């Protein structure tokens, strides 16, 4: 989800119809996943359900779920076009208030009184933000006993029965990703470095100071012996720095579950995923023969069929002191 000026151009001028396509191409957050968040809030937090913030709302899909549990939801995004599209998509409820705001600036935006929110949700956006500033801002928004929920899913992982086929598909996925990134100049600059560091660290670089937070739990699905990065880091300057800010009192729950958010993907679904996640990079419809060759090779490896795809996912939960 767009949360800073550096990412506005990715989603500029994309309407509600585009966001429907985007949601179809990506994994769906399951009801069991949301239950983990809500149970944490009920058992370790205040169990108050008056106000929630959805930071980096994108198409408003998370805000819509929060509106089923909270009396009021404030959904924000740095992109005005994204906010307008989300408003159109979520017209079925009057419980969501949308506003344009950079995530790190929310505490100063006056959208809600300081330290009154019961939950702050931040889905798939923390790598685009200054994590230290963002977590500090969320602390200012939350009331004592309020819950911070930050999550991110990484690159898809092919999970069929044949390991050799899975590995071949993964290599082609990286080659497609590398080709697309090279077309826009590669992965470089301080914002890219910050983003890739957060993803490569599996969000372990997101710190929760004990003066502000308690009952920190880091859930990780399908993260062992894998990378969350969407590109092959060896193609862009070598290994990305991993940062670990996990505190000694924090709980880490690691799970391996190939069925977690599982989807079925063939070559067409891989193409749709890239085109949905990198929309403005496909505005030039001139055929890229190398790129088309990789899609054809992927379809050949798959035998024209599809494979199950799973996801490495990290969910951070913390309770405001």
Curated annotation (Swiss-Prot):
<comment type="pathway">
    <text>Secondary metabolite biosynthesis; flavonoid biosynthesis.</text>
</comment>
<protein>
    <recommendedName>
        <fullName>Methyltransferase cfoB</fullName>
        <ecNumber>2.1.1.-</ecNumber>
    </recommendedName>
</protein>
<keyword id="KW-0284">Flavonoid biosynthesis</keyword>
<dbReference type="InterPro" id="IPR041698">
    <property type="entry name" value="Methyltransf_25"/>
</dbReference>
<dbReference type="GO" id="GO:0032259">
    <property type="term" value="P:methylation"/>
</dbReference>
<keyword id="KW-0489">Methyltransferase</keyword>
<keyword id="KW-0808">Transferase</keyword>
<comment type="similarity">
    <text>Belongs to the methyltransferase superfamily.</text>
</comment>
<dbReference type="Pfam" id="PF13649">
    <property type="entry name" value="Methyltransf_25"/>
</dbReference>
<dbReference type="InterPro" id="IPR051052">
    <property type="entry name" value="Diverse_substrate_MTase"/>
</dbReference>
<keyword id="KW-0949">S-adenosyl-L-methionine</keyword>
<dbReference type="GO" id="GO:0009813">
    <property type="term" value="P:flavonoid biosynthetic process"/>
</dbReference>
<comment type="function">
    <text>Methyltransferase; part of the gene cluster that mediates the biosynthesis of chlorflavonin, a fungal flavonoid with acetolactate synthase inhibitory activity. Within the pathway, cfoB is responsible for the methylation at position C7-OH of flavonoid. The pathway begins with the PKS-NRPS hybrid synthetase cfoA that uses benzoic acid or p-hydroxybenzoic acid as a starter unit with four rounds of chain elongation using malonyl-CoA to form the chalcone skeleton.</text>
</comment>
<dbReference type="InterPro" id="IPR029063">
    <property type="entry name" value="SAM-dependent_MTases_sf"/>
</dbReference>
<dbReference type="GO" id="GO:0008168">
    <property type="term" value="F:methyltransferase activity"/>
</dbReference>
């Amino acid at each position: 989800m767009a949360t800073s000026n550096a990412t506005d151009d990715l989603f500029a001028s994309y309407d509600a119809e585009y966001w429907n396509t985007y949601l179809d191409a990506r994994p769906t957050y399951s009801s069991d996943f949301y239950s983990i968040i809500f149970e944490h809030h009920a058992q370790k937090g205040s169990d108050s359900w008056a106000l929630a913030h959805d930071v980096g709302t994108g198409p408003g899909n998370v805000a819509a779920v929060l509106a089923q549990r909270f009396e009021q939801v404030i959904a924000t995004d740095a992109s005005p076009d994204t906010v307008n599209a989300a408003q159109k998509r979520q017209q079925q409820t009057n419980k969501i208030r949308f506003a344009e705001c950079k995530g790190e600036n929310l505490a100063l935006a006056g959208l809600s009184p300081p330290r009154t929110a019961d939950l702050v949700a931040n889905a798939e956006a923390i790598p685009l933000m200054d994590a230290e500033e963002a977590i500090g801002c969320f602390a200012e928004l939350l009331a004592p006993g309020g819950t911070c929920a930050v999550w991110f899913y990484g690159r898809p992982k092919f999970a069929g029965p044949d390991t050799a086929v899975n590995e071949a598909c993964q290599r082609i996925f990286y080659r497609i990703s590398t080709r697309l990134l090279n077309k826009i100049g590669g992965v470089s600059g301080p914002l890219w470095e910050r983003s890739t560091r957060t993803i490569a660290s599996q969000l372990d670089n997101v710190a929760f100071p004990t003066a502000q937070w308690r009952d920190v739990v880091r859930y990780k699905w399908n993260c062992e012996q894998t990378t969350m990065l969407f590109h092959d880091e060896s193609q862009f300057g070598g290994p990305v720095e991993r940062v670990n800010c996990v505190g000694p009192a924090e709980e880490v729950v690691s799970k391996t579950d190939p069925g977690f958010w599982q989807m079925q993907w063939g070559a067409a679904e891989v193409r749709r995923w890239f085109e949905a996640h990198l929309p403005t990079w496909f505005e030039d419809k001139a055929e890229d023969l190398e790129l088309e060759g990789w899609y054809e090779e992927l379809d050949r490896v798959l035998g024209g069929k599809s494979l199950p795809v799973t996801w490495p996912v990290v969910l951070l939960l913390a309770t405001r002191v």
